[in-house]
Amino acid sequence: MLPNEIAISVQGLKKSYKNVTVLEGVGFEVKTGSIFALLGSNGTGKTTIVKILTTLLKHDSGTAVVNGFDVAAKPDSVRQSISLTGQFAAVDEILTGRENLIMIARLRHLDNPRQVADDLLKRFGLTDAADRRVSTYSGGMRRRLDIAMSLVGESQLIFLDEPTTGLDPEGRIEVWKMVKELAGSGTTVFLTTQYLDEAEQLADRIAILHKGRIIVNDTLAELKKLFPPAKVEYIEKQPTLEEIFLAIVGKKEEKDNGND
């Protein structure tokens, strides 16, 4: 890929906390305008990677380039070109949806904050609830507002760190639809999740993080080719991402144990 087609480039990324190694030479690329899912169990280092890429945490060694800017050398430029939404919605429940958005637009010194807010409310299907306090919103609505707030200023790249944590099925589907729309409009989406069906539904490319390393990085279609379909009552049943994940992680565990 050409440099302007790559939103994120990571090579040999390492990070330790005291005597605990979290990342052991992680490397991957994310194509501009795509949805990239980083998949892994709790505690595997997904959030650590997000914190490094968003300049919230310094890595020990390796390189990380986001939107053409090295995260260590040009952190301010990185921050100006990205948005980050954490695992829990960071909204002010006392304010209305519109007031939350206007507040962020003013903090970012944008022209016509009210128009910015109205445009985002419409884009995220929140116009009818614009003047209600956020405390009355459903989980899915809060998450949509949270992501809308992170996009004030038209970021080229958004990091969604486990965006559907704590949401009911309806709320998760709301967020999935919105993520697809973001990518469709040209925004690059970096998604971390422990929900296999989420990655299966959304991602153009899936990387599996296990014990501090990326053990596989490919499209879902290519991952499925690693495992032949099973025949169930004369019908071919394609493997699910859950089956692929468990098989790959299981094989890696066997290999690691064999080397001990």
Name what the model sees in each region.
Residues 1-14, 251-260:
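ABC-family P-loop ATPase nucleotide-binding domain
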Residues 5-8, 15-191, 196-197, 201-210, ...:
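ABC transporter nucleotide-binding domains
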Residues 92, 189, 230, 255-259:
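Short, polar/charged, Gly/Pro-enriched helix-capping and turn/loop motifs at alpha-helix termini
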Residues 108, 227, 231, 252-253:
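Conserved NTP-handling cores and scaffolds of large molecular machines
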Residues 213-237, 241:
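Conserved beta-strand-loop-alpha-helix hinge in the C-terminal portion
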Residues 245:
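Residue-level signature of catalytic and energy-coupling elements of molecular machines
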